[in-house]
Amino acid sequence: MLSLSKNWNALIKPNKVAYENVSETNNKAKIVVEPLERGFGLTLGNAMRRVLLSSLQGAAITSIKIPAIEHEFSAIPGVKEDVSEMILNIKGIEVKMYVAEKRIIKLKAIGPCVVTAGMIETGHDVEILNPDHVICNLAKNKQLEMELTCKVGKGYVLSTNSYADNLPIGEIAIDALFNPVKSVTYKVENTRVGQVTDYDKLIMFVETNGDLLPEMAVGLAARILQEQLQLFISFEEQEEDKQVKTDALPFSPYLLKRVDELELSVRSANCLKNDNIIYIGDLVKRTEADMLRTPNFGRKSLNEIKEILAKLNLRFGMDVPDWPPENIQELSKRYEDSDN
């Protein structure tokens, strides 16, 4: 009977996720995932992008209260912008909350001045992430006071939604963008594993408002997908599938694979064979200096193997405990069968 686990174990898996910060403020990152099966780059990239832009928790200003102002179609004496324009500007204020409960923050300004988000008194539970953001322009000897309500939520919530129904008179609901992720783009390129050059490499660019680091945002999105997809698994793993998992080894079972599975060039493969390097475990225990002392083994072959090992999250000079095991052939066959 075909092992169920072959459906997922036979697929190539990414060996790591590489994060590269691309801004001084740590809110933009380039994320590279490789290698992936053909088509998986598009599948994962699209799913991650949708979740990142729709499902993460964040904070936003949901309503404002200005003395003597009852609706957004009013004008405030001494303020260049009308209330509707101010609301548009306030929607652009990015906030971070350290508590789950709503908080009221206050703004008090005396003109002449340009009123910015940094003038808001927030207390310890709320932080303004873009303090230079302009709210309005205040004339000389004029005063502006305002209370702003901050809440935690997700997605984009219109002011017409249910939370606006219970607001007291004089408090104006505004549209709230809770999502801490500002933009997500991705592209898929080819990458190489051994002699196969058409595996997928997923490259994502994620920008947040500073509430979360991009690495954390990506991790949360992956966890959301994991929780949603878990319900689709409606079968029990077979006992033979579990056996390989429960047999404890002091090293990765991948080291039991033969080096000829790496699909090396003929020259490199012959050098390893002549030096009696049979298993990947034999290979990674060697240092680069050891390899260069191998007859007919040059720098080109070394770089070829280093590149392949790196894609598998392996390297030369690794400390592999209890290698080689006494029953290496039996173990190698067992794990080979589990993959098949």
From Swiss-Prot:
The keyword DNA-binding does not apply. Its EC number is 2.7.7.6. It catalyses: RNA(n) + a ribonucleoside 5'-triphosphate = RNA(n+1) + diphosphate. InterPro entries: DNA-dir_RNA_pol_insert, DNA-dir_RNA_pol_RpoA/D/Rpb3, DNA-dir_RpoA, RBP11-like, RNAP_asu_C, RNApol_insert_sf. One of its GO terms (molecular function) is protein dimerization activity. It comes from the Bacteria. The keyword Nucleus does not apply. Keywords: DNA-directed RNA polymerase, Nucleotidyltransferase, Transcription, Transferase. GO terms for cellular component: cytoplasm; DNA-directed RNA polymerase complex. GO terms for biological process: DNA-templated transcription. Residues 251-340 are annotated as: Alpha C-terminal domain (alpha-CTD). Residues 1-236 are annotated as: Alpha N-terminal domain (alpha-NTD). DNA-dependent RNA polymerase catalyzes the transcription of DNA into RNA using the four ribonucleoside triphosphates as substrates. Homodimer. The RNAP catalytic core consists of 2 alpha, 1 beta, 1 beta' and 1 omega subunit. When a sigma factor is associated with the core the holoenzyme is formed, which can initiate transcription. Belongs to the RNA polymerase alpha chain family. NCBIfam families: PRK05182.1-2, PRK05182.2-5, rpoA. The N-terminal domain is essential for RNAP assembly and basal transcription, whereas the C-terminal domain is involved in interaction with transcriptional regulators and with upstream promoter elements. This is DNA-directed RNA polymerase subunit alpha. It comes from Rickettsia canadensis (strain McKiel).
